[in-house]
């Protein structure tokens, strides 16, 4: 079963990379039907929703992905970006602090940390 899920995830990633968003969404959703808390599938669905401007939906997917696997820095960064898109600066700062406490680090986190500390962040 896990191999089939991995294959489906890879096909979804390829479809997304080829601009086939509806097919990618269908494949990721197929994974979530059998494993609703699958971190990668939730994250990818969040990325799709974010790309289409559905920020509340993206937040929900990113949150589930983080709850399932809080070690993935990309999940934290995308969650923070979605919060900023919704002008939820205080929430974004709180999530950033949580990410740092979990050990998140690197250039991308340094950049978003600077962004969060600037006046008039958006």
Protein language model features and the residues they cover:
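Short, charge-rich amphipathic alpha-helical segments embedded
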Residues: 30-51
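Structural marker of alpha-solenoid helical repeat scaffolds
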Residues: 34, 68, 101-102
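TPR/TPR-like alpha-solenoid repeats
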Residues: 48, 82, 115-120
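Structural signature of tandem alpha-helical TPR/SEL1-like repeats
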Residues: 2-6, 16-29, 51-64, 86-100, ...
């Amino acid at each position: 079963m896990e191999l089939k899920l991995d294959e489906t995830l890879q096909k979804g990633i390829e479809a997304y990379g080829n601009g086939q968003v509806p097919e990618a969404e269908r494949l990721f959703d197929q994974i979530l039907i059998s494993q609703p808390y699958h971190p990668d599938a939730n994250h990818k669905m969040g990325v799709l929703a974010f790309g289409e401007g559905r920020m509340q939906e993206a937040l929900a997917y990113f949150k589930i992905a983080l709850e399932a696997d809080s070690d993935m820095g990309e999940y934290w960064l995308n969650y923070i970006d979605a919060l900023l898109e919704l002008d939820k600066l205080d929430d974004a700062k709180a999530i950033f602090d949580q990410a740092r406490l979990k050990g998140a680090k690197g250039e991308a986190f340094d950049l978003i940390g600077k962004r969060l500390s600037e006046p008039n962040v958006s």
